[in-house]
């Protein structure tokens, strides 16, 4: 298989990303994923966290919008890195937008929905048509509604 060069490697054999937008003033980022998310064999969450997310966290990013419509499969393991990531965002949040239902089911099987908001109103099909700030405001309002 060949991956279009516009996708960036995170150090995983099967999972690639595009950082679509980051606003360091507001403290949010939009990251799109493609491929197979494999925590069981490759520990992709550790690779993602160490190589990408920790850098963003140090720069003040605390709200993560993860676009998952191109995730082909998910193989879970434990939730340690997800819990760690959740704890580190403090006043922020993690939102999984447009993840396929079967991937959400696998996330829930490993209790990752305790750390990442997903499903329901976060299935935003028209996210590509929204300006990044409008997209952030929409997701943020949906998260705030869930937390209230």
Task: Annotate each PLM feature.
Residues 2-48:
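STAS-typified acidic loop motif
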Residues 31, 52, 94-96:
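Generic structural hydrophobic/aromatic packing signal, biased to beta-strands
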Residues 17-24, 49-56, 120-128:
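Short low-complexity stretches enriched in small and charged residues
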Residues 56, 61-64, 68-111:
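Amphipathic alpha-helical interaction surfaces in cytosolic regulatory modules
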Residues 40-62:
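A short, well-ordered alpha-helical element
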């Amino acid at each position: 298989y060949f991956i279009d060069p516009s996708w960036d490697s995170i150090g995983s054999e099967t999972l690639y990303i595009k950082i679509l937008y980051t606003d360091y003033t507001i403290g949010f980022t939009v990251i799109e994923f493609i491929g197979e998310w494999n925590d069981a064999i490759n520990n992709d969450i550790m690779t993602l966290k160490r190589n990408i997310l920790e850098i963003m966290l140090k720069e003040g990013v605390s709200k993560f919008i993860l676009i998952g419509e191109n995730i082909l499969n998910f193989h879970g393991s434990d939730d340690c890195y997800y819990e760690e990531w959740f704890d580190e965002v403090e006043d922020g949040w993690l939102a999984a937008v447009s993840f396929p239902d079967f991937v959400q089911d696998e996330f829930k099987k490993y209790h990752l929905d305790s750390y990442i908001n997903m499903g329901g109103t976060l299935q935003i099909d028209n996210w590509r048509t929204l300006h990044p700030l409008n997209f952030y405001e929409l997701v943020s309002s949906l998260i705030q509604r869930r937390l209230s």
